[in-house]
């Protein structure tokens, strides 16, 4: 199996997916370990000289003015972890935990945190051998980083807390023993270095952003299939329209629609059936394109964060300086994930309105609720209800978490990011949006079948065929949630996008 090599500087989102979801192991480059060792020497010298340095020879937060003697440094770090492990709620998914372990190791590999090399090796061994700490999903303010959830990670490094190993839940001590990993006794600065960072919010958000890059393509596919089902007008997607307002996402979406419906006999030109379409069809490039640009903005920000040093204080061995700063503050990610959540929610908003156009006979000209025996059968009536419910929930979830700071640590930490809440909310919005788009794909596949002698576009035909392998045409009412779940799974696992991209290049 391929290994991912880390050095703190050039980890990619794709490599993170390999480690988090495909269980690739990691190695650390020798040069990075040299940097880690050199930085550690600075910490040990400062402890020996009893210099006053935050988190090394002082307490934390409001207690930063309390001096700690060198013979108390190990106890200080242990107390930090056991007191800060205050997470609540359901445990994070295993893929997120693996992402957290990877990102924390990569941040330490930059060589500005001051941990011992063997402490970093313990973290890497846990990831490679499958010791996955049980980390509650709630309890982080997002500044100073993800203190509470990361403390649960470090408990297991110390042989405490809880973990899963080979699919079984057990004590952290037992998991480390079974994996053959000696627990660490934290030394000066190490507890702080391990928990003072944004790796939980970033792991949640990075995995989501990878999925969103597929989701925006899927949204274009769904919109294209609905465009055909509505005998939509292709002129609105002409490149001349979009080059005079050259937002990249808008231009890419317009080109995607044109490519997806190429060869379709259902697509019309302006004036053939109607002069212009409703906004949810005609403005797909502007709506989807804006979300596409927001997603790509988030990709850029996350690529910076996964290679960032988010510790405090930071140690610069070449200058022999230890500087207290604020790189732990999650605001760059909090704003990014709030923005991302809004962008995803809009994909669901417009999709649900297209569903309404498909099931409403006054708008579609098709049988009501896409059933030939309306009255006796309800057809797709309640699928639109479900989509409307999910869209309404998204509107609540899209309220920004980052605007809701609350002071902590006796007002020493008087502005916090709520970035982890923003990431978790964005994931919930994504899951709702997947289900809404799944309904649209089902409804559009049903709708096109009411036309005689039609030909779908090259891309939409592949999407339709993929859907029909899992969800049959609805002749009479049946249990709909089964079909909805099957179609949503095709979205979740990216099957539709992967199949369509075999015949059409999607930007």
Swiss-Prot record:
Cited SUPFAM superfamilies: L-aspartase-like
Covalent cross-link 5-imidazolinone (Ser-Gly) as placed by the record, residue numbers: 143-145
Pfam families attached to this UniProt entry: Lyase_aromatic
Keywords from the named record: Cytoplasm, Histidine metabolism, Lyase
Post-translational modification: Contains an active site 4-methylidene-imidazol-5-one (MIO), which is formed autocatalytically by cyclization and dehydration of residues Ser-Ser-Gly.
Predominant cellular place of this UniProt entry's protein: cytoplasm
InterPro entries in the cross-refs: Aromatic_Lyase, Fumarase/histidase_N, HutH, L-Aspartase-like, Phe/His_NH3-lyase_AS
EC number: 4.3.1.3
Subcellular location: Cytoplasm
Top-level lineage group: Bacteria
Family per record: Belongs to the PAL/histidase family.
The protein's name in its UniProt record: Histidine ammonia-lyase
């Amino acid at each position: 199996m391929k290994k991912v090599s880390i050095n703190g500087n050039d980890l990619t989102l794709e490599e993170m997916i390999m480690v988090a979801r495909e269980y690739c192991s990691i190695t650390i480059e020798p040069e990075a370990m040299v940097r880690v060792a050199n930085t550690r020497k600075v910490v040990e010298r400062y402890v020996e000289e009893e210099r006053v340095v935050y988190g090394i020879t002082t307490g934390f937060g409001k207690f930063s003015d309390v001096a700690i003697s060198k013979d108390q440094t190990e106890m200080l770090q242990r107390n930090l972890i056991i007191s800060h492990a205050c997470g609540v709620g359901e445990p994070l998914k295993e893929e997120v935990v693996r992402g957290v372990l990877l990102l924390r190791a990569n941040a330490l590999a930059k060589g500005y945190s001051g941990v011992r090399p063997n402490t970093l090796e313990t973290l890497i061994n846990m990831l490679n051998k499958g010791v996955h700490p049980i980390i509650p999903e709630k309890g982080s303010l997002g500044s100073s980083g993800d203190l509470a959830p990361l403390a649960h990670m470090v408990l297991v490094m110390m042989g405490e807390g809880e973990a899963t190993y080979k699919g079984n839940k057990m004590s952290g001590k037992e998991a480390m023993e079974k994996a053959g990993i000696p627990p660490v006794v934290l030394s000066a600065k190490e507890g702080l270095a391990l928990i003072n960072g944004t790796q939980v919010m970033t792991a949640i958000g990075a995995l989501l952003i990878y999925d969103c890059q597929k989701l925006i393509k899927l949204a274009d596919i769904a919109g294209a299939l609905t465009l055909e089902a509505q005998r939509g007008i292709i002129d609105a997607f002409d490149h001349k329209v979009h080059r005079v307002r050259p937002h990249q996402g808008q231009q890419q979406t317009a080109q995607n629609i044109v490519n997806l419906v190429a060869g379709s006999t259902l697509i019309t030109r302006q004036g053939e059936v109607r002069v212009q379409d409703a906004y949810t069809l005609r403005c797909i490039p502007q709506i989807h394109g804006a979300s596409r640009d927001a997603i790509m903005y988030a990709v850029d920000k996350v690529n910076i964060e996964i290679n960032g040093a988010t510790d405090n204080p930071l140690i610069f061995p070449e200058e022999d300086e230890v500087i207290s700063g604020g790189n732990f503050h999650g605001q760059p990610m909090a704003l990014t994930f709030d923005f991302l959540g809004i962008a995803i929610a809009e994909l669901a908003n417009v999709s649900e309105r297209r569903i309404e156009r498909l099931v409403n006979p006054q708008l579609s000209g098709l049988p009501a609720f896409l059933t030939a025996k309306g009255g006796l059968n309800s057809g797709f009536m309640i699928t639109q209800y479900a989509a409307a419910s999910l869209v309404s929930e998204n509107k609540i979830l899209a309220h920004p978490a980052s605007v809701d700071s609350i002071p902590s640590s006796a007002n020493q930490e008087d502005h916090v990011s709520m970035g982890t809440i923003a990431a978790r909310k964005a994931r919930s919005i994504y899951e709702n949006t997947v289900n809404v788009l799944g309904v649209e794909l089902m409804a559009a596949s049903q709708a096109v079948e009411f036309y005689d002698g039609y030909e779908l576009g090259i891309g939409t035909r592949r999407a339709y065929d993929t859907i029909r392998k899992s969800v049959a045409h609805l002749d009479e009412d049946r249990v709909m949630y089964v079909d909805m779940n099957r179609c949503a799974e095709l979205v979740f696992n990216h099957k539709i996008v992967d199949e369509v991209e075999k015949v059409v290049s999607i930007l």
